[in-house]
Amino acid sequence: MKIKLLVPAIFLLMFSNFSFSQVEDTLNSDLYSWLKTIPDIEVTAIKPDKIFTEAYEIFVTQPIDHNNPDGPKFKEQIFLSHVDKDKPMVIELDGYAVNNRTTELSRILECNQIMVEHRYFGESVPSPFDWKYLTIKQAADDHHRIIELFKDYYSGKWISTGISKGGSCAIFHGYFYPADVNASVPYVGPLNLSIDDQRVYEWIKSVSTPECREKVFNFQKLCFEKRDELYPIILKNAEEKKLTYNIVGYEKAYEYSVLEYSFAYWQWGNGDCSLIPDENSSTEEIWEHFLANGGVTYFDDESIESNYPFFYQCYTEFGYYAYEVDKFKDYIRYADGQTPFFIPKDSNPTYDPRLLKKINNWASNEAENFIFIYGGNDPWTSPGVCLTGKTNSIKMVLPNGSHA
């Protein structure tokens, strides 16, 4: 989602002492020397993007349990990209595994950035492994510690950001540590209040136009009606791409993929409903559209297992969404709309929405210096922040915008 005009203008107002002119960089060796003096981090120089002068892959040693700082540790991967120590710092709090890339905000502000991988994802998996330390608060403590560490070097303004689950993480961090940064820009940060948040259902029933919603529904119905033609294609696709569906079950996974379509279409689609196939379309056209917009690869074993940390968080604190099955009851044989198959087999999560409700209330009524950005078609906007006008925070919704 690209907000190219308003965000720069707002930041110029919020940070009127910023200087965006290029300055002669004399701090390269100074930064590396400083990094080498910090205990409990590992530093490797990497090639920077062209807007930066230096970049590093860094592993920060973190307590697995911040309530027991002398206990077992793990290494959390971050990427630091440098321009000037006096310029702003954008810190992206990612919700998943992370690869180094340049954020929209650091390009706009021509400033430094840190990309933070989320605990239990990618290269940042604790050992010994214990699900109970994968919590919102523990991750916020990770982020707080990283910010404290690098504030010793970077004296400019700090801006936190994140996309999708990372946007939620920026909100979570702000709730626990509001003084850590000067401003926050969460992109598409949902705050679910239930394991099957009903706001998602209502969103899908009201987004776009009645004609477009009808085309989405009719396509789902078409996929069920053409099950005998499409299901063998899914099996062939699975064989070619070495996908298995043993966790959910092959036929049940097909049904959930069709149910997921209405969510996935609005999440990632461009809103051009004229491109949705209908009963006059060929089986190949239906399949290609389904593959591009549905959940065919969302329910395979590898995808589920790689997302186990996310799903564990959904079933403990984050919340999630389920699927409405009543309108397809004449077609469904296996799916009941719930997703317990997403829960890691070696875990026993208990869902507790109390923290999310507190954070949602805080974000709506008390959060200062936030710019909440959402997409107008994205179902994840439905559990987004609803501001009450009590603070200086603003919410921006891109018309017809997706999750991207």
Where are these regions (language model features)?
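Alpha/beta-hydrolase
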Residues: 7-8, 172-310
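Conserved alpha/beta-hydrolase
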Residues: 106-126
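Glycine-rich nucleophile elbow surrounding the catalytic serine of serine-hydrolase chemistry
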Residues: 162-172
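C-terminal subdomain of alpha/beta-hydrolase-fold enzymes, centered on the catalytic histidine
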Residues: 265-404
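Bacterial Sec-dependent N-terminal signal peptides
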Residues: 1-27, 204-212
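Alpha/beta-hydrolase fold nucleophile elbow
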Residues: 154-164
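Alpha/beta-hydrolase active-site loop
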Residues: 133-152
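Catalytic-loop region of hydrolases
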Residues: 20-112
